[in-house]
């Protein structure tokens, strides 16, 4: 195998931003943030949803609008989305 062409495969902490859950796994993700976890320093990758917060795994329905998607939709399709018929 050629040297220097493969990504750095290392332990990374992923943090679920919706509930704060953290877990360690191995990944090639590139990130500048680090975190102290279980006595060691790891690269930190922030994610919006994980198995700890996704409704399929938790059995609970939860509405998340972290990116303002509802407001963006209402601004774009305001009259049509509110049920008013355009004539």
Curated annotation (Swiss-Prot):
InterPro entries: Ribosomal_bL28/bL31-like_sf, Ribosomal_bL31, Ribosomal_bL31_B, Ribosomal_bL31_sf
Gene3D superfamilies registered for this protein in UniProt: Ribosomal protein L31 (4.10.830.30)
Biological process annotations from GO: translation
Gene Ontology cellular component list: ribonucleoprotein complex; ribosome
Name of the molecule in the record: Large ribosomal subunit protein bL31B
A molecular-function term among this protein's GO annotations: structural constituent of ribosome
UniProtKB keywords: Ribonucleoprotein, Ribosomal protein
Gene giving rise to this polypeptide: rpmE2
Family: Belongs to the bacterial ribosomal protein bL31 family. Type B subfamily.
NCBIfam families listed in its UniProt record: L31, PRK01678.1
Subunit structure, interactors included: Part of the 50S ribosomal subunit.
């Amino acid at each position: 195998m050629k040297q220097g062409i493969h990504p750095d495969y290392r332990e990374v902490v992923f943090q679920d931003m919706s509930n704060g859950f953290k877990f360690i796994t191995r990944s090639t993700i590139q990130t500048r943030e680090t975190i102290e976890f279980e006595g060691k320093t790891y690269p930190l990758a922030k994610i919006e949803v994980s198995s700890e917060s996704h409704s399929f795994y938790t059995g609970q329905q939860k509405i998340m609008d972290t990116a303002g998607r509802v407001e963006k939709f209402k601004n774009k399709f305001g009259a049509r989305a509110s049920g008013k018929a355009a004539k």
